[in-house]
Amino acid sequence: HSFIKNLLLDNLLLVDIYNRAKKLHIEADVRRVVMILEMPQEKDHSSMESVKSLFGGKSKDFITAVDEKSIIVVKELEDGENYPEMDQLAHTILDTLGMGNDGKTHMAYGTIVNELKEVSRSYKEARMALDVGKIFFGDKEVIAYSSLGIGRLIYQLPIPLCKMFIKEIFGGKSPDDFDEETLVTIDKFFENSLNVSETSRQLYIHRNT
């Protein structure tokens, strides 16, 4: 699995990716997606084995890890498989491990890529989805990079710029000073990617309010 780890971490030259893949009989031009399961504490051996058994030892899928708390799945997609199936698979993995609805375990996945060299991008996207998900979608167990909405944009802004904006808009007011109704409205506004019409519809209030 050292090849897959190095591939995920972007440690290989393009020529090495294809040469080593050829030696290991790994197809280069197939659809793949990277999924990351992140646990609140260090994973044990049984968690890794449970995930592996879910995939039935398929040689085309790779299950590995690059740190203590995560299990990474590099999944090869069958014809007809797309994001809805990946979402379903992520929930199945959480349920199989008995970690569904614990509020502490999350699963994220990047975009589907068509070439082996793009696997590291899908991995980076899944990592970002985990981070953004914790900030903007704390109640979600499964987070897709392609569904992050405005959160993906805000997360990539420089922190000093965000602080300047908050100071400019709110002055000396702290978020703790807002009443519950205002906080719910703001939360719903972000949830709907700053769509005023959809936010007002869900809150049953007029958009001008």
Predicted regions and their residues:
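Cytosolic nucleotide-utilizing catalytic cores of signal-transduction proteins
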Residues: H1-T209
